[in-house]
């Protein structure tokens, strides 16, 4: 009977040790998960802060680039605008003549003396 009693005491002590280890491990797990959650929240906040900073930097870069471009390209003078407008009007006026020539449906569009230099051969154009 004494051996059963000593065995009971030994098992009781072992049970207490196991329970204390369990409690200690649970506390460690709780601390670890708490630390991980804190770290995760900190990383999330740092990421959001970095994203906002990056967006501000991109906007600043875009604004600086736009300001640089406006300084780099001066406003054209009125005479240059007039010349450009007349040029494009002339191009649009002559497009139909050149288009027909390039499609092989009409002779060389500018002057009769130049027709000898660039002969119009309708049979080649149709092939």
Curated annotation (Swiss-Prot):
Cellular localisation: Cell projection, Cilium
GO cellular component, one term: cilium
Pfam families listed in its UniProt record: CEP15-like (PF15134)
Signal peptide extent: none
Keywords associated with the record: Cell projection
Principal location: other
Function according to Swiss-Prot or TrEMBL: May play a role in ciliary assembly.
Protein name from the UniProt record: Centrosomal protein 15
Species, as recorded: Mus musculus
Gene this chain is encoded by: Cep15
């Amino acid at each position: 009977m004494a051996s059963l009693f000593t065995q009971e005491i030994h098992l009781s002590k072992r049970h207490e040790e196991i329970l204390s280890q369990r409690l200690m491990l649970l506390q460690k797990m709780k601390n670890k998960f708490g630390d991980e959650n804190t770290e995760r929240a900190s990383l999330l906040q740092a990421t959001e802060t970095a994203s906002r900073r990056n967006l501000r930097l991109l906007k600043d870069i875009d604004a600086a680039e736009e300001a640089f471009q406006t300084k780099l390209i001066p406003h054209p003078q009125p005479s240059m605008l007039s010349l450009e407008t007349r040029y494009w009007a002339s191009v649009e006026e002559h497009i139909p003549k050149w288009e027909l020539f390039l499609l092989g449906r009409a002779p060389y569009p500018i002057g009769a003396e130049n027709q000898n230099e660039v002969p119009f051969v309708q049979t080649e154009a149709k092939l």
